């Protein structure tokens, strides 16, 4: 421990000395959270601890080294101490980030190590499919923490590998051709039955002008043969064409955009040929220049066997257990993963690509559980977006009317309706107030139905989410925060049970009925735009368990710094 501290102090001194010529810079962040919870359930419970307290402090210390104008080296170490540890116990040291990136001959950009990457929504994309409403106030703090922990940024996935990109410019016909390529390793070999698995691909984007863009995209998950005793290598290929055309008039902008392609997924020893399917997504776009109004309407058709795990991997695997009050009642039953847990527990989230169909909660999102790349969906969608010039009002809404392409366990098809809307009203910008005052409203509704003459095939499930958030600046940099989050779901579903290859082998009937309500409030003080202290109290009730409803009150203190 003493030697580690000496090394850190030495690096600080070296960094301070070198910052004059920007050879070495410090980047990173620090966070400390203290929490105290009081838990109770409707049943007499003499086993579960009523009170729980905990917390931690951590610092992510990164050194960005620029040995020359075209090279950057970043190494970041995390030091974390759980509260309750003494004399160094409970302290962990981890390497959080490590990469080298640069430019060769002012033409080719490269990055090796940790890369944050995405391509298109159907090939390689990190869909946020489970948080359907815009986070605000208290929930915004929670979501910022989980996004930081899992490196969620602009729908990218954090991977380990290498990436390159370069562009060619032309005087005529085509303005620019841009090439992107990447390769990452999903899992190592165990020298036994598990083969080395990689994920690679890229795209070529032709920009004819600012009015027309055409892209050719391809990704592949593949096992490297001869890296284990297993000869049954897996491969998942996805190829697509993406496009965007725009007609810019004096008062209006019209356009069309979309992506269409095919996928194949198979094992090398599979004599059936594996799974092969297609997807189509096309939409017409409109923008009114003066008002700022934007609208789109489109059609999507994702085949039942369409597989693209770089775009269908979920952030949360709903088969896992809670880490906060995992069990309760005298029988110590498992507490189901709640909707509000998705905000409350960053450890539920993953930043890895999963080669397989991940579990989801139909109450949370049954319409597009894997985002826009969800397989076995066909239908229409539309959207509306409006922002005033002063950005005092921001409104966005999306609607989906979809159905299954192929029935599950029956020839009857599910029909889906989904609508979500988010409104942000900034009083300070609207009334020209000096102090910031902001109200945010988020609403989501989903409806799933399947009709049949047979009662056991009938499905009806409805879910509603409502979030109200208020931020009021009382005095300079001191904010009052208030949040009301409500979630309700009622109905039934028939969830498929799949084997390791993703084939449906059975169905599980689910009866869903319950409500969640969280009321939260607190104070937040901004030392700077990137450093703040917040004290929050919240009250949660949940009635989804078929055995016993529960409630818990929780008090938090957050200290967050980014540098």
Provide a role label for each language-model segment.
Residues 1-24, 563:
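Bacterial Sec-dependent N-terminal signal peptides
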Residues 19-47, 53-57, 65, 69-75, ...:
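Transmembrane beta-strand segments of Gram-negative outer membrane beta-barrel proteins
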Residues 22-27, 60-75, 78-97, 101-102, 186, 190-194, 263-275, ...:
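Outer-membrane beta-barrel proteins
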Residues 31-36, 40-47, 111-205, 215-234, ...:
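Surface-exposed coil loops of outer-membrane beta-barrel proteins
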Residues 64-182, 280-281, 286-311:
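Outer membrane beta-barrel
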Residues 229-563:
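Exposed, low-structure sequence patches enriched in small/polar residues
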């Amino acid at each position: 421990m003493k030697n580690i501290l000496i090394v850190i102090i030495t690096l600080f001194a070296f960094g301070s000395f070198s910052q004059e010529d920007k050879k070495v810079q410090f980047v990173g962040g620090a966070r400390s959270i203290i929490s105290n919870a009081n838990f109770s359930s409707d049943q007499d419970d003499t086993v579960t601890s009523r009170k729980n307290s905990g917390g931690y402090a951590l610092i992510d210390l990164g050194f960005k080294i620029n040995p020359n104008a075209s090279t950057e080296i970043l190494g970041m170490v995390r030091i974390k101490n759980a509260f309750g540890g003494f004399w160094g116990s409970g302290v962990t040291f981890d390497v959080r980030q490590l990469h080298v990136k640069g430019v060769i001959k002012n033409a080719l950009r490269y990055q090796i190590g940790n890369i944050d990457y995405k391509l298109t929504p159907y090939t390689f994309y990190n869909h946020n499919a489970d948080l359907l409403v815009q986070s605000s106030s208290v929930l915004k703090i929670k979501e910022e923490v989980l996004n930081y922990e899992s490196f969620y940024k602009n729908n990218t996935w954090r991977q380990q590998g290498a990436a390159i990109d370069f562009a060619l410019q032309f005087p005529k016909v085509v303005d620019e051709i841009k090439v992107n390529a990447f390769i990452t390793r999903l899992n190592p070999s165990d020298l036994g039955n598990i083969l080395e698995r990689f994920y690679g691909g890229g795209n070529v984007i032709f920009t004819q002008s600012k009015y027309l863009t055409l892209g050719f995209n391809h990704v592949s998950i593949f096992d490297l043969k001869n890296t284990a005793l297993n000869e049954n290598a897996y491969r998942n290929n996805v190829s697509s064409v993406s496009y965007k055309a725009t007609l810019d008039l004096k008062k209006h902008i019209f356009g069309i955009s979309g992506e269409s392609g095919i996928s194949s997924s198979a094992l090398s020893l599979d004599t059936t040929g594996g799974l092969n399917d297609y997807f189509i997504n096309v939409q017409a776009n409109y923008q009114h220049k003066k008002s700022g109004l934007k609208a789109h309407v489109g059609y999507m058709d994702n085949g039942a066997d369409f597989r693209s795990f770089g775009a269908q991997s979920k952030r949360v695997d709903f088969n896992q257990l809670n880490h906060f009050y995992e069990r309760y009642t005298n029988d110590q039953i498992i507490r189901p993963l709640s909707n509000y847990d998705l905000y409350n527990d960053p450890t539920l989230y993953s930043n890895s690509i999963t080669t397989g169909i991940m579990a989801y909660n139909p109450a949370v999102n049954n319409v597009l559980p894997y985002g826009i790349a969800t397989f076995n969906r066909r239908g229409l969608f539309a959207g509306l977006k409006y922002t005033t010039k002063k950005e005092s009002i921001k409104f966005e809404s999306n609607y989906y009317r979809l159905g299954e392409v192929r029935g599950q366990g029956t020839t009857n098809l599910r029909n889906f309706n989904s609508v979500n809307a988010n409104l942000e009203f900034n009083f300070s910008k609207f009334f020209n107030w000096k102090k910031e005052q902001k109200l945010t409203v988020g609403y989501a509704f989903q409806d799933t139905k399947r009709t049949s003459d047979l009662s056991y095939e009938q499905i009806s499930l409805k879910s509603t989410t409502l979030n109200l958030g208020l931020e009021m600046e009382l005095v300079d940099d001191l904010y009052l925060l208030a949040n009301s989050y409500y979630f309700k779901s009622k109905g039934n579903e028939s969830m498929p049970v799949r084997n390791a290859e993703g084939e449906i082998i059975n169905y599980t009937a689910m009866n869903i009925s319950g409500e969640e309500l969280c009321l939260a409030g607190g104070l937040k003080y901004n030392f700077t735009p990137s450093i703040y202290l917040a004290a929050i109290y919240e009250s949660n009730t949940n009635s989804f368990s078929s055995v016993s409803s529960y409630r818990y009150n929780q008090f938090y203190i957050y200290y967050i710094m980014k540098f």
